[in-house]
């Protein structure tokens, strides 16, 4: 093989004729074709469709590159031949608009489409089709064929279905952590090795019918802690809330009788377990009696809520499904590789009479779960992994023989799939490694094994619901020695109180059952350990480089010595509703044992108490807090003080149902009114609200990438912050410290009040409160400086992808800045979001849903999953395999993968906030060596909705949505732009525009045309195709070489703040200065405070000399000879008129061409100067020019001799003034000009000759200066050039007084 030394097409073709085959020759020729066709003239041709649809949505190409499929608003799909442009097939059958369409990459003639009513159809162009409907008729958002397998991925709502179309329905489903996290896009790479998913980021989402709940002070600290853990916040209105409210309207109580099954794993259902030992039968019967005692009939099916349905119809088909036993426990050395076992199920459930017929082989018992227990850094939105077996730890003794029993006893207490985090894990970690990186499971469920499983059994779907734990605070099974008749609630008249009493009764009954189990078992130490597991899901951390494992000790149980006692994170605030004050108030529980501090030191051992009646009291922990004492003593039930569960209350501030505890002591408890009578609440709320707003602003101001840094994203490096962000950070720290002092003062007063009312318990109450009841603010403020070290590989990790961080390059234009306001007037996120919502509503009211979706605050995360082994993606985990954290997606055309699978193009929100926000087209690398690295960027407005990479991956096309009504008649309209990827990591210069795609528009059409999808034709140099909102399907092909287009685009692509000098003659014919503005154009210019350019000449105030205006732009600056003063004075009228006649026509033709492309032109005339700003249709081609007029006396002044230097030097002398204005915070337009008749100033005339135009530099990323609000986007790009004349010297050559 001979390597081609150079890119010489003639030699390559000559060698190919002689039979020589050079390596890479084919690719070089294809690249050459792409480079040459960009200079050719492109002609668009409409495809004649059968019934003239109103809109065209998506395009897809067949694998043989001969057919083009398009979806339309008339519910049909049309198949067009690419070469001839003729429609050859019409696929009719959808009841609503098909929203997505795709060809099978390898099977010819196979098309899949999904419509808005939840129907998926697979069409065979040779005849026939298969269809499947979603259960809830949710719209189909995206479809993806696997290139080699008979597999179709269906994205709908928050689920991804896996369908083999030879079956009647999908065989597996994975779900996100909540219904708010909708799946918007699924895409395989060209080889099918990796899967790309786009899922809504839940942090800025709300339901359609869910009101916005502000974050108050009690939740703000936990919001900050979740940000530290790099996990998404818990949704504040859990599904269980709706479920309990639905049950509260009934006269009956809570139905908890049936076996609760959690759709939590992706593994097939295991067979029923073997017969239980005789020691377990009494417990089972006791539990059955309890279940019958508290069970009530329900009449309504609630399966649509995503919760376990308890109605008779659904529960009749349910069978208890138990955890598999594990006969042997791995040694301590094998903890890191021991997979966890999860409770699994399939739907629909097998009836009891069919259980024996559906038994599988015993090998499935040991199948690991799809996703193992995830560490604390991602615990906020991970699986509720009900792992009661050995999860990466060894449990010595007979404990390993009872996981099924404990699971069976817990499961009926779970209220459907929303029992939150029953066994949430928080791993022990040293102080230096307090934030472990997220990880996926060591072994995932294989789709092939699922298929084999179902071939031998039923056709049931494997539903893997990783719904984030919300609702019930599953803080474990609190044990009590008392009957539990005390209550801290006085709201007996409310429905919540009745519901709470029912729940309290259930918990008390359940606690009695636990005491019965303990007395029957007689295994006190093992019971304690299992109880701790049920409460905390203690998981030993994999030893890190600086974290040595604790030596194994039989009496200390090293498997427990490195764990934490972790309460449910949803149970961090214990608030009760006080009817007297009509507010939720904090209860400060006291605990009989245990110490805690603000450090992250882990306990070294647990000491088992050999008392047969001992129980583990619940140790309340705030979120993320860990006890640091070396020994945690297990107190017996005979201790003087003990907690009691008195019920469950709904916390309106945090949106959680939370268990309420009270203290059982000899002297009784203190009432809520007495505890809170002296506590100031208003100032705390004000501080919390102020701190919340500051934190929200700081997050947006800093734009700090926490994944690539070892610092907390809330507290970034001050050197990288703007002044406004730095001020917000300091205020947050100050308010946090003040809140900590207030909390300590409140606790001191509470302790003093308790000691005065309960003298018997005062001896041991003080240390317990000071140690255990540590508030979160104390903990965070004291420890955040040592804990904010997130590992560099915390962003992306998977077994096959390796652990790395995609490199993010903070280019100068993407660094944080204070926004479009001055820093003291910087709006917060709430104001900014509100304005964007208003803009989005206005745009969508005009039918522009694509632009509205980009303006809205919705963002998506792109995750990259390894699919080589057909493992189900863990889409419930929002922090693993994240390729792009935030991007904008409108439809399947908003994201594209190159044909070679090496590049990914997507739209991401800009760090610079505006109204509306800008967007950035970002091209990322998918290569293994730099996966996730941002290579190319380009700024765009919110009307960029479609992106397509060329077949060779060297060009990118951006499709545009319409923004406004046409202001003038036009025969062509720009609908897309094509850019060349030329310099990686070059910022705005990394892409270079090469040409625009123009849509031929009828003369009577007054509206802009939007593109819904634009795609390159699959062969290099063939052309492109796009579909519009008018129903057109247009195929553009390069027809003929355009000789002047190369030179034209070279000139047009130069930066606007560079002065160009060339020898082109300005004597160029053009259009006349006839009036061509429409009435709407004139009205719009007046509305925004600008004077439209009139054909009449302006008269200066120095005389009656009529001046003709001369307009030139900064891009095509022409150098002219400076006329002599005498010549200029003798004939100013004729000379200026002739010059303006030629040069003005050239500028006018340029303005008309820009406006034909959808741009806008503003002209401002003053007494002595004229400023013109022309903005292209997309806002990234801005021309600003300034002209200073000369009166008849100018030429004879002595100062005119000093201005006879060549024009470029004059321009350079004038350039710094605009920068000085910007530094002072003044816009060039608002700078004070010398007006005639101004008191205290002598009106002086400028000394520049009429032939010396002044170009004005324009800084595109800047937001200073006046903005032309004539368009919806890019209004903060334009700087007026009116400041250029400020350097004009007076008659004595001195700078003029400003």
Curated annotation (Swiss-Prot):
Presence of keyword Lipid biosynthesis: no
Motif mapping: PxP motif 1: 275-281
A GO biological process held by the record: mitophagy
Composition-biased stretches (Pro residues): 268-277
Effect of residue 1043 to D: Phospho-mimetic mutant; increased interaction with ATG8 family proteins and increased mitophagic activity
Residue ranges annotated as motif PxP motif 2: 1206-1212
Pathway: Protein modification; protein ubiquitination
Motif mapping: LIR: 1043-1052
Substitution effect: residue 482 to A: Abolished cleavage by caspases without affecting cleavage by calpains
Residue windows of the WD repeats: 51-90, 93-133, 135-175
Main location group: endoplasmic reticulum
Motif TQT motif 2 per UniProt: ranges: 1116-1118
Record site: Cleavage: 482-483
Start and end residues of each stretch annotated as Disordered: 254-284, 343-413, 458-494, 538-561, 590-690, 747-796, 1060-1079, 1112-1143, 1190-1214, 1227-1298
Modified residues (Phosphoserine): 52, 328, 394, 443, 635, 639, 1043, 1205
InterPro entries from the UniProt entry: AMBRA1_autophagy (IPR052596), WD40/YVTN_repeat-like_dom_sf (IPR015943), WD40_repeat_CS (IPR019775), WD40_repeat_dom_sf (IPR036322), WD40_rpt (IPR001680)
Motif (TQT motif 1) on chain: 1104-1106
Recorded family membership: Belongs to the WD repeat AMBRA1 family.
Biological function: Substrate-recognition component of a DCX (DDB1-CUL4-X-box) E3 ubiquitin-protein ligase complex involved in cell cycle control and autophagy. The DCX(AMBRA1) complex specifically mediates the polyubiquitination of target proteins such as BECN1, CCND1, CCND2, CCND3, ELOC and ULK1. Acts as an upstream master regulator of the transition from G1 to S cell phase: AMBRA1 specifically recognizes and binds phosphorylated cyclin-D (CCND1, CCND2 and CCND3), leading to cyclin-D ubiquitination by the DCX(AMBRA1) complex and subsequent degradation.
Protein's recorded name: Activating molecule in BECN1-regulated autophagy protein 1
């Amino acid at each position: 093989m001979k390597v081609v030394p150079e890119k010489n097409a003639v030699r390559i073709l000559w060698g190919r004729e002689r039979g020589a085959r050079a390596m890479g020759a084919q690719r070089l020729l294809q690249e050459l074709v792409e480079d040459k066709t960009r200079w050719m003239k492109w002609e668009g041709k409409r495809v004649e469709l059968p019934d003239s649809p109103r809109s065209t949505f998506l395009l897809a190409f067949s694998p043989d590159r001969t057919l083009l499929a398009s979806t339309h608003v008339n519910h049909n799909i049309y198949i067009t031949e690419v070469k001839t442009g003729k429609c050859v097939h019409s696929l009719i059958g959808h009841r609503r608009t098909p929203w997505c369409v795709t060809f099978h990459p390898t099977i010819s003639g196979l098309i899949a489409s999904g419509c808005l009513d939840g129907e998926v159809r697979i069409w065979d162009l040779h005849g026939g089709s298969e269809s499947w409907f979603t259960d809830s008729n949710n719209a189909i958002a995206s479809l993806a064929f696997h290139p080699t397998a008979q597999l179709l991925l269906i994205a709908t709502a928050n689920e991804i279905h896996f369908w083999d179309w030879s079956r009647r329905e999908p065989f597996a489903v994975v779900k996100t952590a909540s219904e708010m996290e909708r799946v918007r896009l699924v895409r395989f790479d060209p080889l099918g090795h990796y899967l790309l998913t786009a899922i809504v980021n839940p942090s800025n989402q709300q339901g359609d019918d869910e009101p916005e709940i502000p974050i108050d002070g009690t939740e703000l600290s936990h919001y900050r802690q979740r940000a530290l853990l790099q996990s998404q916040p818990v949704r504040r209105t859990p599904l269980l809330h709706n479920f309990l409210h639905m049950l509260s309207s009934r006269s009956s109580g809570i139905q908890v009788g049936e076996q609760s099954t959690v759709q939590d794993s992706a593994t097939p259902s295991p067979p029923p377990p073997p017969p239980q030992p005789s020691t377990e039968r009494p417990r089972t019967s006791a539990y059955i009696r309890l279940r019958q005692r508290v069970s009530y009939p329900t009449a309504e099916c609630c399966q649509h809520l995503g919760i376990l349905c308890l109605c008779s119809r659904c529960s009749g088909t349910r069978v208890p499904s138990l955890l598999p036993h594990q006969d042997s426990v791995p040694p301590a050395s094998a903890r890191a590789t021991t997979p966890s076992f999860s409770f699994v199920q399939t739907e629909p459930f097998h009836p009891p009479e069919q259980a024996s017929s559906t038994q599988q082989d015993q090998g499935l018992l040991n199948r690991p779960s799809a996703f193992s227990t995830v560490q604390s850094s991602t615990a906020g939105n991970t699986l509720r992994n009900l792992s009661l077996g050995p999860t990466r730890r060894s449990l010595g003794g007979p404990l390993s023989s009872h996981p099924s029993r404990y699971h069976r006893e817990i499961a009926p207490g779970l209220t459907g799939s929303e029992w939150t985090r029953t066994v949430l894990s928080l791993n022990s970690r040293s102080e230096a490694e307090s934030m472990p990186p997220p990880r996926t499971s060591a072994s995932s469920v294989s789709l092939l094994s699922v298929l084999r499983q179902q071939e031998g059994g039923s056709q049931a779907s494997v539903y893997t619901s990783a719904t984030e734990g919300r609702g019930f605070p599953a803080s474990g099974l609190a044990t009590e020695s008392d009957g539990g008749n005390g209550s801290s609630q006085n709201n007996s008249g409310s429905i919540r109180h009745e519901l709470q009493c029912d729940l309290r009764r259930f918990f008390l009954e359940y606690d009695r059952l636990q005491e019965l189990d303990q007395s029957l078992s007689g295994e006190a130490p093992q019971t304690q350990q299992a109880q701790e597991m049920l409460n905390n899901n203690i998981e030993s951390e994999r030893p890190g480089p600086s974290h040595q494992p604790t030596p194994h000790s039989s009496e200390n149980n090293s498997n427990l010595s490195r764990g934490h006692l972790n309460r449910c994170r949803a149970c961090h605030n214990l608030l009760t509703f006080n009817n007297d004050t009509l507010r939720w108030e904090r209860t400060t529980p006291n605990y009989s044992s245990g110490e805690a501090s603000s450090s992250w030191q882990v306990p070294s051992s647990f000491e088992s108490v050999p008392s047969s009646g001992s129980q583990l009291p619940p140790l309340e922990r705030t979120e993320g807090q860990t006890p640091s004492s070396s020994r945690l003593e297990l107190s017996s039930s005979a201790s003087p003080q003990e907690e009691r569960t008195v019920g469950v209350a709904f916390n309106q501030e945090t949106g959680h149902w939370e268990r309420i505890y009270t203290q059982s002591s000899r002297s009784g408890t203190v009432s809520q009114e007495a505890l809170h009578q002296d506590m100031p609440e208003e100032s705390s709320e004000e501080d919390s609200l102020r701190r919340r707003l500051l934190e929200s602003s700081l997050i947006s101001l800093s734009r700090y990438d926490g994944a690539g840094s070892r610092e907390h994203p809330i507290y970034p490096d001050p050197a990288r912050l703007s002044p406004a962000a730095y001020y917000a950070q300091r205020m947050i720290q100050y308010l946090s410290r003040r809140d900590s002092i207030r909390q300590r003062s409140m606790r001191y007063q509470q302790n003093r009040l308790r000691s005065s009312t309960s003298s018997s318990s005062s001896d041991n109450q003080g240390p317990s409160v000071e140690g255990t009841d540590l508030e979160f603010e104390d903990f965070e403020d004291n420890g955040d400086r040592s804990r904010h070290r997130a590992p560099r590989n915390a962003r992306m990790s998977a077994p096959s992808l390796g652990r790395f961080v995609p490199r993010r390059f903070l280019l100068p234009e993407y660094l944080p800045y204070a926004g479009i306001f001055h820093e003291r007037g910087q709006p917060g996120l709430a104001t900014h979001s509100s304005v964007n919502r208003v803009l989005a509503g206005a745009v969508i009211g005009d039918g522009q849903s694509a632009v509205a979706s980009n303006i809205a605050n919705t963002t998506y995360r792109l995750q990259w999953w390894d699919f080589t082994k057909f493992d189900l993606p863990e889409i419930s985990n929002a922090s693993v395999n994240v390729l792009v954290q935030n991007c904008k997606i409108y439809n399947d055309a908003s994201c594209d993968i190159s044909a070679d699978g090496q590049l990914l193009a997507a739209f991401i929100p800009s760090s610079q906030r505006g109204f509306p926000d800008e967007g950035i087209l970002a091209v990322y690398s998918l290569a293994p060596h730099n996966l996730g690295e941002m290579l190319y960027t380009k700024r765009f407005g919110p009307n960029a909705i479609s992106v397509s990479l060329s077949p060779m991956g060297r060009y990118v096309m951006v499709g545009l949505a319409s923004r406004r009504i046409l202001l003038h008649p036009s025969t062509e309209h720009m609908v897309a732009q094509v850019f060349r990827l030329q310099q990686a990591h070059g910022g705005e210069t990394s892409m270079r525009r090469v040409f625009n795609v123009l849509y031929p528009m009828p003369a009577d059409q007054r509206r802009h045309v939007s593109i819904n999808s634009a795609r390159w034709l699959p062969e290099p140099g063939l052309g492109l195709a796009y579909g519009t909102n008018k129903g057109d399907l247009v195929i553009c092909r390069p027809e003929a070489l355009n000789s002047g287009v190369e030179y034209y685009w070279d000139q047009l692509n130069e930066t606007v703040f560079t002065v160009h000098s060339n020898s082109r003659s300005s004597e160029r014919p053009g259009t006349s200065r006839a009036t061509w503005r429409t009435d709407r154009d004139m009205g719009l210019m007046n509305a925004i405070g600008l004077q439209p350019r009139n054909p009449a000449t302006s008269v200066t105030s120095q005389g009656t000399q009529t001046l003709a205006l001369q307009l030139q732009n900064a891009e095509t600056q022409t150098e002219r000879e400076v006329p002599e003063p005498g010549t200029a004075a003798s004939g100013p009228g004729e000379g200026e008129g002739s010059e303006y006649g030629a040069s003005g026509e050239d500028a006018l033709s340029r303005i008309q061409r820009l406006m034909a492309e959808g741009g806008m032109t503003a002209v401002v005339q003053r007494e002595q100067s004229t400023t013109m700003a022309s903005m292209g249709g997309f806002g990234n081609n801005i021309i600003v020019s300034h002209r200073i007029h000369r009166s008849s006396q100018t030429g004879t002044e002595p100062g005119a001799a000093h201005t006879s230097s060549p024009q470029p030097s004059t321009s350079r002398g004038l350039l710094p003034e605009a920068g000085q204005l910007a530094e002072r915070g003044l816009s060039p337009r608002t700078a004070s000009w010398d007006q005639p008749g101004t008191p205290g100033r002598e009106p002086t005339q400028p000394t520049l000759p009429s032939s010396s135009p002044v170009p004005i530099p324009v800084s595109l990323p800047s937001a200073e200066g006046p903005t032309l609000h004539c368009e919806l986007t890019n209004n903060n790009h334009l700087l007026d050039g009116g400041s250029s004349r400020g350097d004009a010297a007076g008659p004595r050559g001195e700078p003029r007084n400003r």
